Swiss-Prot record:
Post-translational modification: Phosphorylation by ROCK2 regulates IL-17 and IL-21 production.
Pfam families xref list: IRF, IRF-3
GO CC annotation: cytosol; nucleoplasm; nucleosome
Keywords: Activator, Cytoplasm, DNA-binding, Nucleus, Phosphoprotein, Transcription, Transcription regulation
Example GO biological process: myeloid dendritic cell differentiation
Molecular function GO labels: cis-regulatory region sequence-specific DNA binding; DNA-binding transcription activator activity, RNA polymerase II-specific; DNA-binding transcription factor activity; RNA polymerase II cis-regulatory region sequence-specific DNA binding; sequence-specific DNA binding; transcription coactivator activity
Protein's organism: Mus musculus (Mouse)
Gene3D superfamilies recorded: 2.60.200.10, Winged helix-like DNA-binding domain superfamily/Winged helix DNA-binding domain (1.10.10.10)
Family: Belongs to the IRF family.
Induction info: Not induced by interferons.
DNA-binding region, residue intervals: 21-129
Quaternary assembly: Interacts with SPIB and DEF6. Interacts with the BATF-JUNB heterodimer. Interacts with BATF (via bZIP domain); the interaction is direct. Directly interacts with NLRP3 in the nucleus of Th2 cells; this interaction enhances IRF4 ability to bind to the IL4 promoter and is required for optimal IRF4-dependent IL4 transcription. Interacts with SPI1.
Protein name: Interferon regulatory factor 4
Known function: Transcriptional activator. Binds to the interferon-stimulated response element (ISRE) of the MHC class I promoter. Binds the immunoglobulin lambda light chain enhancer, together with PU.1. Probably plays a role in ISRE-targeted signal transduction mechanisms specific to lymphoid cells. Involved in CD8(+) dendritic cell differentiation by forming a complex with the BATF-JUNB heterodimer in immune cells, leading to recognition of AICE sequence (5'-TGAnTCA/GAAA-3'), an immune-specific regulatory element, followed by cooperative binding of BATF and IRF4 and activation of genes.
Length: 450
């Protein structure tokens, strides 16, 4: 394929007549070898792994002529864009190439080597040898939606919330108490999901105006109790004291792993929470510092060190009276799984500089009551964090860098429930003195200086 001569259309490896006859594999190899696209390079001498620039169109330094050139070339090659006739649409060009890569059995993304949260983001792909190919890939739900023209993944539909509960969410923040965020015990038909984000991911969602002038905005949290919940049972003062002591506990038990090998285990003690990071820290706050150690010399050391290099600002975790929160400050992508994860079979990403709730105390206690009184499955209280790689990922269980986090109060109450099955726990409410600023402790971490 000659890419160096002819009109601008042939410059991008395309002609209007032959656009549908080429294959992505050979086309991409030709583009990489041409050297015309900055950042599109081979990663190894064997020319089996390559890096492809992946800058978002919303970046301030985005240059359409340069950053969208490869995506435009693919659209030209496939006949999906006609120079001088069709309106330029870089996001759609990018979507088409991404879907083609995901669908093709010629390519496999090396997620642990891709970097999407740096100033010049890129993805890394491996060209699958002919003898190692599997059947054709199936497009994921996100890919299908993107191909259909949706610029962002769409969440599954949920039934409408009861009017009273919607009213609570529409109240101004300063008029809300913690009860407005607690589970509505009278509507067991509402499944628990946290968070349920309406509209484009990473964008502020704004719903239609209501007749009373209120408008629903933001990210919603809805939860319901188990199908059957035993009424409050009087308990001995000693048990009540044990519960109260546990519920005032802000400690976190944290285990750090490299490739399933435990490299550090500790318990944090600061009421302000902790910061998980790597390398030297210059933090002057009261956060406990949880540092990933330098990896031993093994086959994955370089890959691990590369991921660790993007953890400088780290991840902040803290316990509030109502649950465990996280705020990602580092460049590295962080994915998580836990009792509040929206998806159990595909990645849940912590967005940068946004607070996310990972564990809900009220939900845990409701499930613990049912476990203790009715023998239901034990409630989940462990959160898994995965750094630099998509998680959960059923196809690739072993990850380079992970952390397991448990609120110590949850483990204590779970063990206590095991030992006192049948006469444990009353209906739990957050203390009356918990004010709105206390509830939103995330605000205390929004001004952390790095």
């Amino acid at each position: 394929m000659n890419l160096e001569t002819g009109s601008r259309g042939s410059e991008f490896g395309m002609s209007a007549v032959s656009c549908g006859n080429g294959k992505l594999r050979q086309w991409l190899i030709d583009q990489i070898d041409s050297g015309k696209y900055p950042g599109l390079v081979w990663e190894n001498e064997e020319k089996s792994v390559f890096r492809i620039p992946w800058k978002h169109a919303g970046k301030q330094d985005y240059n359409r002529e340069e950053d969208a050139a490869l995506f435009k070339a693919w659209a030209l090659f496939k006949g999906k864009f006609r120079e001088g006739i069709d309106k330029p649409d870089p996001p759609t060009w990018k979507t088409r190439l991404r879907c083609a890569l995901n669908k093709s059995n010629d390519f496999e993304e090396l997620v642990e080597r891709s970097q999407l949260d740096i100033s010049d983001p890129y993805k890394v792909y491996r060209i699958v040898p002919e003898g190692a190919k599997k059947g054709a890939k199936q497009l994921t739900l996100d890919d299908t939606q993107m191909a259909m023209g949706h610029p962002y993944p769409m969440t599954a539909p949920y039934g409408s919330l009861p009017a009273q509960q919607v009213h609570n969410y529409m109240m101004p923040p300063h008029d809300r108490s913690w009860r407005d965020y607690a589970p509505d015990q009278s509507h067991p038909e509402i499944p628990y999901q946290c968070p349920v984000t309406f509209g484009p991911r990473g964008h502020h969602w704004q719903g239609p105006s209501c007749e009373n002038g209120c408008q629903v905005t933001g990210t919603f949290y809805a939860c319901a109790p188990p199908e059957s919940q035993a009424p409050g049972i009087p308990i001995e003062p000693s048990i009540r004291s044990a519960e109260a002591l546990a519920l005032s506990d802000c400690r976190l038990h944290i285990c750090l792993y490299y490739r399933d090998i435990l490299v550090k285990e500790l318990t944090t003690t600061s009421p302000e929470g902790c910061r998980i990071s790597h390398g030297h820290t210059y933090d002057v706050s009261n956060l406990d510092q949880v540092l990933f150690p330098y990896p031993d010399d093994n086959g994955q050391r370089k890959n691990i060190e590369k991921l660790l290099s993007h953890l400088e600002r780290g991840l902040v975790l803290w316990m509030a009276p109502d649950g465990l929160y996280a705020k990602r400050l580092c460049q590295s992508r962080i994915y998580w799984d836990g009792p509040l994860a929206l998806c159990s079979d595909r990645p849940n990403k912590l967005e940068r500089d946004q607070t996310c709730k990972l564990f809900d105390t009220q939900q845990f206690l409701s499930e613990l009551q049912v476990f203790a009184h009715h023998g239901r499955p034990a409630p989940r209280f462990q959160v898994t964090l995965c750094f630099g790689e998509e998680f959960p990922d059923p196809q690739r269980q072993r990850k380079l860098i992970t952390a397991h986090v448990e609120p110590l109060l949850a483990r204590q109450l779970y063990y206590f429930a095991q030992q006192n099955t049948g006469h444990f726990l009353r209906g739990y409410e957050l203390p009356e003195h918990v004010t709105t600023p206390d509830y939103h402790r995330s605000l205390r971490h929004s001004s952390i200086q790095e």
